[in-house]
A protein has these predicted regions:
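Substrate-binding clefts and catalytic carboxylate motifs of secreted carbohydrate-active enzymes
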Residues: 1-143
Length: 143
């Protein structure tokens, strides 16, 4: 199916939905696309990365759903993306927390998608500063 689209894109969540290190996972995925599919040479985008956090849940243990874990996971994901030769861009999923339908109750605390770098009231989580610092540190960042 890579023969038809002009761009190859993937939504990946290393360190969130699986424990694979972000750089290892992305390199294996990118190499597979380049070597084994019709996506060779096409622009490659990471169209979703992220991890969930409950606003205000902070713990030095860096457990899932904590702001510390989210900031650390996103930092590792973005570092992997910007370090991957041939990767053309990335989207952080998502800017703000948002409600989801009731059927997600078992995996979504508060019936929310809590992957925002700010909460539903636009209060920044720790990951907000992490994302800002990483993007502002890029040579291509335009202020």
């Amino acid at each position: 199916c890579f023969g038809m689209p002009e761009v190859v894109s993937y939504n990946i969540y290393p360190l969130w939905y699986h424990d694979t290190q972000a750089d290892v996972y992305l390199k294996e995925l990118y190499d597979w696309v380049q070597e084994k599919t019709e996506g060779t040479g096409k622009p490659f985008l990471v169209t979703e990365i992220g991890a969930g956090a409950i606003y205000g849940y902070r713990t030095p243990a860096e457990v899932k759903w904590s702001e510390e874990y989210q900031a650390s996971a996103i930092q590792k994901q973005l570092t992997a993306v910007f370090g991957q030769e041939g990767c053309s861009g990335v989207y952080v999923w998502q800017f703000c927390d948002g409600r989801v339908c009731d059927s997600w109750f078992g995996t979504r605390p508060r019936t929310m998608n809590n992957k925002g770098i700010v909460d539903e009231y636009r209060r920044p989580k720790l990951s907000y500063e992490t994302v800002k610092r990483i993007f502002r540190g890029l040579d291509t960042y335009v202020n």
